[in-house]
């Protein structure tokens, strides 16, 4: 492996409580039925508007309106609910970068939010590509984020979402995430997946991944083969 693309929520950052609370606060603000913690957690990894559409029988336009409300509430909630990295994440990422792996990030978050957390964790110097939900037309489980990330890793000024420009990189690419959306994105792109069990997905949901780990530090063992 040479290229590694990481999810953020539930993989690098422990954000479940913040996301679930903000989803539920948004439901209250929009006079919607408040879904359970478990129901909300299952949508983590989807783009916000898609999360609301999946939870409620609503139109795409209504989903966008809910997403806008969510972002307003999120700005207040994040002041008191700090997202911390999971154990062994920071030191492992820095070790991989030092060892010569090319690292990228693919998250359904919008770029403003994602960049803020990357800077908070002081990780901006180790990622060659950061792809957010508002950077592509089709988010997870579509493969667009993988193709765009690899294009940026290659130094393309205007990375395309076609596999043709990066097909020689796919066999050397690993996607690391905590949800079935991440596994599906990897496989749709033509690369392999490693799932973490400490995030938002269950081991059963992640069974299709080539590797499953319980601790982020175990990634080093997988890469050493």
Regions of interest found by a model, annotated:
Residues 32, 101, 191:
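Short phosphate-binding/catalytic loops that engage adenosine nucleotides
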Residues 18, 47-50, 84, 91, ...:
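Short alpha-helical
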Residues 33-39, 58-68, 158-171:
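Short, surface-exposed acidic
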Residues 21-25, 50-51, 69, 91, ...:
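Alpha-helical elements of Rossmann-like donor-binding domains used by nucleotide-donor carbohydrate transfer enzymes
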Residues 1-42, 56:
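Active-site neighborhood of HAD-like aspartate-dependent phosphohydrolases
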Residues 1-2, 97, 111, 116-225:
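Asp-based, Mg2+/Mn2+-dependent phosphohydrolase catalytic module
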Residues 76-105, 111-115, 143:
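Short, acidic loop-to-helix structural element flanking the phosphoryl-transfer center
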Residues 45-77, 87-95:
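A metal-dependent, Asp-based hydrolase signature
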